[in-house]
Amino acid sequence: MKSCGLLPFTVLLALGILAPWTVEGGKNDAIKIGACPAKKPAQCLKLEKPQCRTDWECPGKQRCCQDACGSKCVNPVPIRKPVWRKPGRCVKTQARCMMLNPPNVCQRDGQCDGKYKCCEGICGKVCLPPM
């Protein structure tokens, strides 16, 4: 008889423990509003210690964005209407890096500034001027 009265208490206790965990777990995968600024082709002289791993480690509206040297908290730029293809062709690269999964700076042309296109570079996709 006493175990029936204990069941609702146990359920409420479990929900009280699990509810904050589910909220926090989802936050790590979510992203904040706005887009990371487009990355320009650049050489990194020294890899820096990452400032962040997720947007939620950055203050306010800042997003955790990758640049040539690592990840940093930066102010996002407004998201424009997505552009999948810009005019022009990508330059063919003759060399390839030996990295198994090279990091991509972009996925489509709309992520690159101005007339730059998202092209296959020596080591992953990068924003390059078209031919």
Curated annotation (Swiss-Prot):
It is found in: Secreted. Residues 85-131 are annotated as: Elastase inhibitory domain. The record marks M98, M99 as: Reactive bond for chymotrypsin, trypsin and elastase. PROSITE patterns: WAP (PS51390). Changing K92D: Loss of antimicrobial activity. Changing R96D: Loss of antimicrobial activity. It comes from the Eukaryota. GO terms for molecular function: DNA binding; endopeptidase inhibitor activity; enzyme binding; mRNA binding; serine-type endopeptidase inhibitor activity. Residues 29-77, 83-131 form the WAP domain. One of its GO terms (cellular component) is Golgi apparatus. The keyword Repeat applies. Keywords: Antibiotic, Antimicrobial, Disulfide bond, Immunity, Innate immunity, Protease inhibitor, Repeat, Secreted, Serine protease inhibitor, Signal. CDD domains: WAP (cd00199). One of its GO terms (biological process) is host-mediated perturbation of symbiont process. Disruption phenotype: Mutant mice show delayed epithelial wound healing and an increased inflammatory response at the site of wounding, possibly due to increased elastase activity. Mutant mice show an increased tendency to die from toxic shock after exposure to bacterial lipopolysaccharide (LPS). Mutant mice are highly susceptible to M.tuberculosis; all die within 50 days after infection. Mutant mice are highly susceptible infection by L.major. Contrary to what is observed with wild-type, the parasites are not restricted to the initial site of infection, but spread to spleen, liver and bone morrow. Induction: Up-regulated by bacterial lipopolysaccharide. Up-regulated in lung after infection with M.tuberculosis. Down-regulated by IFNG. Up-regulated in lung in response to bacterial pneumonia. Up-regulated in macrophages after exposure to L.major. Not up-regulated in spleen in response to bacterial pneumonia. Up-regulated in wounded skin. Acid-stable proteinase inhibitor with strong affinities for trypsin, chymotrypsin, elastase, and cathepsin G. Modulates the innate immune response after bacterial infection. Contributes to regulate the inflammatory and immune responses to the intracellular parasite L.major. Down-regulates responses to bacterial lipopolysaccharide (LPS). Plays a role in regulating the activation of NF-kappa-B and inflammatory responses. Has antimicrobial activity against mycobacteria, but not against salmonella. Contributes to normal resistance against infection by M.tuberculosis. This is Antileukoproteinase. It comes from Mus musculus.
